């Protein structure tokens, strides 16, 4: 009799676990039913993440999508600590400097801005009144603040926030000299943490990631060809120096940073109020009181 009760208890616990797994509310937009989506927006307090990657060459040893893969890994783990809805894969950003490399997908400036605007508009129409663009691509660091600034051009009933980067972590192993901007030690370490099966460490030295220094200009002078002039192989640094341990430290720091950002944004009640105030005053600038 006792054995029978034990069997019943085990079956009950297993069944309960299966039901619990089935009823756990996903954070991924594309995995939610229409009914569950309504619940998810309420649980997220209208806060939704738009992880922003890119499709480009990453040295001779990594795939084309680390920026997208890593930022989605980070956001998917961050929302386990602070719930928010995650928009599906998005990679329609700025990558003109890599158009000469196989596999790069570079959309026109007009499409980049228009598609991003329509995407955030549609997110807001579906209840995302706080849209958090989590940037995973260095080439977007001018595009995204500019896009956020353009939200002041006309009224919106939602706020766009842009989050990128994380606090520096302690270096694991010896310090390496030279720039480490793209597909080098840092980014390769992150991939060894998030998607190690996609990294070919034996190929990391097949090309040079050294700065070629082909244009001599003052630091405060900018030209669009600067990246190609310095890193024509679209590789900056030394991927062979990467370690999973460094990746674990960096990725965890990134996750923690995104968690803090989500919490701060959920608590932010002022940005939308001030945005609406600004819209109103901008219609009557001569009435603005000093």
What are these regions (language model features)?
Residues 7-16:
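Bacterial N-terminal signal peptides
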Residues 1-7:
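Bacterial N-terminal signal peptides that target proteins for export
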Residues 1, 16-21:
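Short, low-complexity disordered leader/linker segments with a strong preference
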């Amino acid at each position: 009799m006792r054995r029978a009760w034990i069997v019943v208890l085990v079956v009950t616990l297993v069944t309960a676990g299966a039901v619990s797994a089935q009823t756990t509310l996903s954070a991924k937009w594309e995995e939610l039913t229409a009914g569950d989506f309504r619940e998810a927006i309420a649980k997220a307090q209208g806060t939704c993440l738009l992880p922003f990657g890119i499709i480009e060459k990453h040295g001779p040893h990594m795939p084309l999508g680390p920026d997208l893969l890593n930022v989605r890994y980070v956001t998917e783990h961050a929302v386990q600590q602070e719930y928010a809805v995650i928009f599906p894969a998005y990679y329609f950003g700025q990558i003109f400097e890599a158009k000469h490399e196989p596999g790069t997908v570079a959309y026109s400036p007009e499409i980049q801005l228009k598609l991003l605007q329509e995407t955030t508009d549609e997110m807001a129409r579906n209840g995302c009144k706080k849209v958090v663009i989590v940037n995973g691509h260095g080439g977007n660091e001018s595009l995204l603040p500019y896009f956020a600034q353009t939200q002041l051009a006309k009224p919106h009933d939602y706020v766009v926030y842009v989050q990128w980067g994380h606090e520096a972590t302690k270096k694991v192993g010896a310090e390496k000299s030279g720039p480490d901007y793209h597909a080098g030690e840092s980014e390769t370490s992150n991939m060894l943490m998030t998607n190690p099966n996609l990294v070919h460490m034996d190929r990391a030295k097949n090309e040079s990631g050294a700065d070629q220094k082909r244009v001599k200009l003052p630091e405060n002078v900018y030209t669009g060809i600067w990246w190609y002039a310095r890193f024509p192989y679209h590789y900056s640094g030394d991927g062979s120096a990467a370690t999973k341990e460094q990746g674990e430290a960096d990725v965890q720091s990134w996750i923690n940073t995104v968690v803090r950002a989500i919490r701060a944004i959920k608590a932010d009640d002022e940005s939308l109020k001030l945005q609406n105030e600004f819209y109103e005053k901008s219609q009557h600038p001569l009435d603005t009181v000093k």
